[in-house]
Amino acid sequence: MSGKKGSRRGFLGAAVAAPALGAMALADPGRAAAQAAGVKRGDLPDLTIKQVKVLVLKPEERRAPAGAPGVPSGPGGRGGGGGFAGPPGARTGEKLASIVTNSGIEGNYTLDDRYFHPNWSNLGWLDYAKNAWVGKSVLDLPALTSQWRPSLRRYGQLSYAAAVDNCCWDILGKAAGLPVYRILGAYRDRVRAYASSQHLRTVEEFVADVKHAMSDGFTAYKIHPPSGVAGGHDYKLDMEVIKAVRKTGGDNMPLLYDPVGALTREEAMKVGRLLDELHYVSFEDALPTKDIDGLVELAAALDVPIVMGEFMPSLYDYVPYILRGATDEVRFIVDNIGGITGGMKVARMAECFNMMCQPHNWGTLLDHVVHFHCELAMPNNIWFEVTQPLGTADRPYFKDKITLDKEGYVPAPVKPGLGYELDRGVLDNMMLRVES
């Protein structure tokens, strides 16, 4: 263990850290940030929630963007609505949450991505949202999403709240005429993107994929190796991929690696030493999330940052990982942690400990976008994960797409709300039914 790393971990004493954790992590970001952006309650229309709906779209044939090497492995793809939503040609019917206020402002979010609720369904979410939110003001968002509420402390309940929370932030931005990140408190106006690979099968596919990403303008790349959720656990193949991607990307390209918790402790140590040797910048989900002792050992032995948090279902789950030094950086999925509101709490909690925070981005356009707004408002993040190949997350019922500038950054949206506008004509043509 290096002296630098050991001294830093020793500094994380629970007696010193716990007061800061409670003070900052449980703070509600919305109201104070809105005031800082110059938005006052009296300036806004009636934001009482009037109606909650689910827009169910017709199945569509999904295809990989032109020139993309390889296909995602396994039926259904990653994360339900993520990636190609299964191999090219698979048919999926996507679902959008719709929340409408008395003043007619609508907020939307996807219901197709990762949710931890044990009995997730459209009708279950509708029942929750109608009973808990109709008649309430969007301005009272913290009172409805805080984990101090006993009902939201139960496993998975934050998933139900997350979809509503994201819709409400969309509404707030539209009402104020500002992109959401401006209300949260803008820290930057663009974020550097890295191409986040599919679970490809061979070294050759990864080499082709890195070249494709570089030709699209990406300056960084993350490996989702064959030993991930696609099956075919073979850490030795992972190591060959890791070496080939470094050789292809060159010495200066930031590279990240995410086996999605598929490795054993022994395998993770061997892979981690190779990541150190080749100067990778992130080792995400090196072990299953619950193996906190193994993560402590791994983090102490390696220089590559260990990144955990994607599969944590509440704010409280992060605490032992931070205090015990089981992770160098934290990560979140807003769908699991209470929406944008919960994600910003995780980011602030990490900031208390001088830690970086990497939000997850994978899935549909809106899944990318809600995390993007958090990233634009966070001082302790430098990355925007973009599903590879570029264009995979695009949907025909949106007028806007994720684009890279000439330096490989994604510029902030300028439109109000989530900032990526629905094409109502296309959406209406794709509508299968409305559940309410």
Regions inferred by a protein language model and the residue ranges of each:
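Metal-dependent enolase-superfamily TIM-barrel catalytic cores that perform enediolate-based chemistry
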Residues: R190-L302
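C-terminal segment of N-terminal export signals and the immediately downstream linker at the start
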Residues: A25-F84
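Glycine-rich, aromatic-flanked loop segments that form ligand/cofactor-binding clefts
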Residues: G156, D165-Q198
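Conserved, mostly hydrophobic/aromatic
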Residues: G104, G177, F283, Y321, ...
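Shared catalytic-loop signature of beta/alpha-barrel
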Residues: A129-N131, R273, H279, K290-Y409
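Metal- or metallocofactor-binding catalytic centers and their adjacent structured scaffolds
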Residues: D46, V100-A175
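Flexible C-terminal active-site loop/helix
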Residues: G42, L47-K50, V54-L57, E61, ...
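N-terminal secretory signal peptides and thylakoid transit peptides that target proteins
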Residues: M1-P19
